[in-house]
From Swiss-Prot:
Produces ATP from ADP in the presence of a proton gradient across the membrane. The catalytic sites are hosted primarily by the beta subunits. Keywords: ATP synthesis, ATP-binding, Cell inner membrane, Cell membrane, CF(1), Hydrogen ion transport, Ion transport, Membrane, Nucleotide-binding, Translocase, Transport. Its EC number is 7.1.2.2. GO terms for molecular function: ATP binding; ATP hydrolysis activity; proton-transporting ATP synthase activity, rotational mechanism. Belongs to the ATPase alpha/beta chains family. It is a peripheral membrane protein. The keyword Transport applies. This is ATP synthase subunit beta. GO terms for cellular component: plasma membrane; proton-transporting ATP synthase complex. It catalyses: ATP + H2O + 4 H(+)(in) = ADP + phosphate + 5 H(+)(out). It is an enzyme of class 7 (translocase). HAMAP family: ATP_synth_beta_bact. The lineage of its organism: Bacteria, Pseudomonadati, Thermodesulfobacteriota, Desulfuromonadia, Geobacterales.
């Protein structure tokens, strides 16, 4: 097949119009390449993806890297296929960019197998319907909003409440305990955090079981809008061809939407609510429907979701909500109390918080914990106006237990050891259930509430109380 060439007719930021000869237009999602001397001295080093057909034998494309240095009339080569990334075991331990090139200066991937980044979601008949919980070792999550194996989990939170730290702790806990392969997509987040994660994984010895795909804040919107799809293709290969249970971490899914909205305006689409792209729900659906479990293997995904201005009704987080099996909501009020992870125990939900999945004992304790915390929340207005003395004896007891529960929901993290100075704790589910059932039963009413702060198991809280008493 003879090579198809076109030429640049217009450059508008990250969007480039290319003219072709009549009858030779590349289809939507096809990859094109052009030489940009501002990137490096390689030929055809900039990848474009066809987004629209404009008529007049022209296509509108989105650039995957910087367009500074491009000029009208430059030659563009049609690659004859969509953007493809290397897949398979050679990607493990490596950092790739959106087009599957290594960016860790450790030489080429040297892989023969590639997957396109736009793929169909698995058919209904091939999807798995098995439901089981998996343990993360984080008390508040395992007790109140447990994660499903092969499910989709969202970590919601505003700026600076600890989403990335929680994701890094989950990688640390699950990747070490789980033993399978992990894929991490860094979508429009800080490059420093990406670097920290790489170093962290290297030190803890889980790097050789993980593939990292980065398109960070400094990348153009085209790369940020596609990098999650590149990572997903790598995860799909492990699920479909190797029958693995894969973990997919995405930090941050909001940046995927944000990049889509940046590009959408340049493509000439009329914006919808709050200035987002009109195709918001479709784009989110195309990504999320591919993250699923089949009868060959599973993809369990944990996605950090930035909440603009702490408003959960913003279209970006609200659209993501519909796809999730469990939501872990991080709250600024709880972070201000110094309780980390700052998970809101009343706002966080899980589809599998159900006695048929997690058992009667776990379900009963979780509901009692939520009841006590809700009662405390309801009493806070009275306490603020009249003080604790005006409460009945029964309510005073509820408040005391609620404050202990609140403190006991905190936990020292392995990845934060350098900042907190206290060693991280992984708490088994049975220990979590035992601890909270004892607090609710009133076995530890005599201990000071400070004893429950930043400990793992209830035994550690008792030990801490003895030290405090000295």
């Amino acid at each position: 097949m003879s090579q198809n060439f076109g030429k640049i007719s217009q450059v508008i930021g990250a969007v480039i119009d290319v003219e072709f000869e009549p009858g030779k237009l590349p289809p939507i999602y096809q990859a094109l390449r052009v030489t940009n001397p501002a990137i490096d001295d390689q030929e055809f080093n900039l990848v474009l993806e066809v987004a629209q057909h404009l008529g007049e034998n022209a296509v509108r494309t989105i650039a995957m890297d910087s367009t500074d240095g491009l000029v009208r009339g430059q030659q563009v080569k049609d690659m004859g296929k969509q953007i493809s990334v290397p897949v398979g075991k050679k990607t493990l331990g490596r950092i790739l960019n959106v087009i599957g090139e290594p960016v860790d200066e450790m030489g080429p991937i040297g892989n023969e197998k590639e997957y396109g980044i736009h793929r169909e979601a698995p058919l209904f008949v091939n999807q798995s319907t098995k439901v089981e919980a998996f343990t993360t070792g984080i008390k508040v999550v395992d007790l109140l909003a447990p994660y499903a194996r092969g499910g989709k989990i969202g970590l919601f939170g505003g700026a600076g409440v600890g989403k990335t730290v929680l994701i890094m702790e989950l990688i640390n806990n699950i990747a070490k305990q789980h033993g399978g392969f992990s894929v991490f997509a860094g979508v429009g987040e800080r490059t420093r955090e990406g670097n920290d994660l790489w170093m962290e994984m290297k030190e803890s010895g889980v790097l050789d079981k993980a593939a990292l795909v980065y398109g960070q804040m400094n990348e153009p919107p085209g790369a940020r809008a596609r990098v999650a799809l590149s990572a997903l293709s790598i995860a799909e290969y492990f699920r479909d061809e190797e029958g693995q249970d894969v973990l997919l971490f995405v930090d941050n899914i909001f940046r995927f939407t944000q990049a889509g909205s940046e590009v959408s305006a340049l493509l000439g689409r009329i914006p919808s609510a709050v200035g987002y792209q009109p195709t918001l729900a479709t784009e989110m659906g195309e990504l999320q429907e591919r993250i699923t479990s089949t009868n060959k293997g599973s993809i369990t995904s944990v996605q950090a979701i930035y909440v603009p201005a702490d408003d959960l009704t913003d279209p970006a987080p609200a659209t993501a909500f519909a796809h999730l099996d469990a939501t872990t909501v991080l709250s600024r009020q709880i972070a201000e109390l110094g309780i980390y992870p700052a998970v809101d125990p009343l706002d966080s939900t899980s589809r599998i918080l159900d006695p048929q999945v997690i058992g009667d004992e776990h379900y009963a304790i979780a509901r009692q914990v939520q009841y006590v915390l809700q009662k405390y929340k309801d009493l806070q207005d009275i306490i603020a106006i009249l003080g604790m003395d005006e409460l009945s004896e029964e309510d005073k007891l509820v408040v005391a237990r609620a404050r202990k529960i609140q403190k006991f929901l905190s936990q020292p993290f392995h990845v934060a050891e350098a900042f907190t100075g206290s060693p991280g704790k992984y708490v088994e589910l049975k220990d979590t259930i035992k601890g909270f059932s004892e607090i609710i039963a009133g076995k530890h009413d005599d201990l000071p509430e400070q004893a429950f702060y930043m400990v793992g198991t209830i035994e550690e809280a008792i030990e801490k109380a003895q030290k405090l008493a000295v």
